[in-house]
Amino acid sequence: MYYSSGNYEAFARPKKPEGVDNKSAYIVGSGLAALSAACYLVRDGQMQGGHVHILEKGELPGGACDGYKFENLGYVMRGGREMDNHFEVMWDLFRSIPSIETEGVSVLDEYYWLNKEDPNYSLCRATEKRGQDAHTDGKFSISDKGAMEIMKLFFTPNEDLQDKKITDFFDDEVLSSNFWLYWRTMFAFENWHSALEMKLYIQRYIHHIGGLPDFTALRFTKYNQYESMILPMVKYLESHGVQFHYGVQVCNVEFDCTDPARKLAKRIDVLRGGEKDAIDLTENDLVFITNGGCVENSSMGSQNKPAAYNTELREGGGWDMWRKIAAQDPDFGHPDKFCHDPEKTNWMSATVETLDGRIIPYIKSICKRDPFTGHVVTGGIVTVKDSSWLMSWTINRQPQFRDQPKDHCLVWVYSLFTDKPGDFVKKPMRDCTGKEICMEWLYHIGVPENEIEDMAANSANTVPVMMPYIDAFFMPRAYGDRPKVVPEGSVNFDFLGQFAETPRDTIFTTEYSMRTGMEAVYTLLNVDRGVPEVWGSVYDVRDLLNATVKLRDGKKATDMDLSFGEKMVLKKALSKIDGTDVEKLLKQYGVI
């Protein structure tokens, strides 16, 4: 497997890998990484669909990419996905996945057209004082000292960031800025999370720094991600004869690692309908393992019931399976680095369905758009700056579900601090019913206090979800804590998803999951085509200059708070580039 960039590799079709007709694949889980691996096995690996087996413990595919209407409960979206125009693997695959809405059109086509015709941008990024614009006004509000803290992290070698926290590099100069308000709420970072991952994020999205305050950097699907992404992939795979095995729980994968140069997956231990079973493997049976799980132990509440906070990892779950696998070889990772402290990895979301028109005027007042036009509404999350829960909420294009009533609006609410009492509902979010969470949200969007309870009870249906391990992948880590996608010496197995190690890309993204699937297939089948490299904006001087200026709210280098000696050094340096292309470039991007 090798990385590539450019159209030469992107538009090429690989030859059929040698011996692929004699191989089979067993994929543990049916999340985005697993489905991507299956798609690449079929499209580029040219494996017969009937030889590809997806083992899913539940009744539906999709993993964390969900979006369902549950009978007697309501609509539930545990999370949402923010996409980037340089998710290179994602677009490489979706150009080949047919739309399930429009014949002759790919998922990429419909996504591209939608975001061209209805580009994303926010008209209100944050509120305070019960629905008033917080007037962050597109500013990062970072001091020169704060900018230097970010720069220090940016240039620190990855090896020196192992097991380091964000607070090891940032103090209040950054953590009290608009930059951190935008960043932590957009990506769900906490102060105690991995400094290494923070650096990777800054480098990965350096080309989008200017688009973070108003979300012009982002693109979204038409519907929820289950309907817009998962279902088209499933239909594509089914059309090629791929075998979906629901109700099959993988408990362990057994390996022979006696020869470090030839590590073999020998058996998959499963439960089928509660009965123990096993799948014996040969070298021609490839195993794709989704290890860990950010939505494991998730629980749903209801309008009148809180979501349970279940932190005990059960036998037979994704973490338990990874622990059993990791015990067999040190190269298979260290799961407990990520799942040992749910107080540092949990947050909650809630899906609010409006049932009449009473709440809509308050939404319009903040986002300055009508949510029923079918176009962009909030354009990304609106963060309640003075919320004790650090609440954010968003409304994507409506409807979010194909069967959603036309006069109902779906709002996604999430909060990072589930253990703090609310500002109106004096309880921690984790102890609140859906109705109570809706009341807290209504309070923060400016609904009169004497109307809040009635509106939450009769004008909305709210379903809360607690996810104890949703931020597990952000915990401080060292190299080796996550297994490589294909570990050294592997003959017939690999790891997929957010807890597999691949260089330069960032976790908690659709792209990361899909990239691990592509890399796994290309490595095990020796597919003779390049995997698109992570977009290289961090190596583009234009993007670096632009980001430097935008991060400092347009402040030029010559306007920095410098000592007399520093000013003299800068003046002398600028004199050396007078009349050169370097000077033109610095002026073009506002550095001088």
Predicted regions mapped to residue ranges:
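Helical element adjacent to the flavin cofactor pocket in flavoenzyme catalytic cores
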Residues: 203-286, 290-292, 304-305, 310-319
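C-terminal segments that line or cap access tunnels to active or ligand-binding sites in enzymes
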Residues: 206-221, 284-286, 291-516, 522-539
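Extreme N-terminal leader/targeting segments of oxidoreductases
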Residues: 1-25, 43-51, 69, 551-592
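Beta1-alpha1 glycine-rich phosphate/pyrophosphate-binding loop at the start
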Residues: 1-3, 37, 41, 45-85, ...
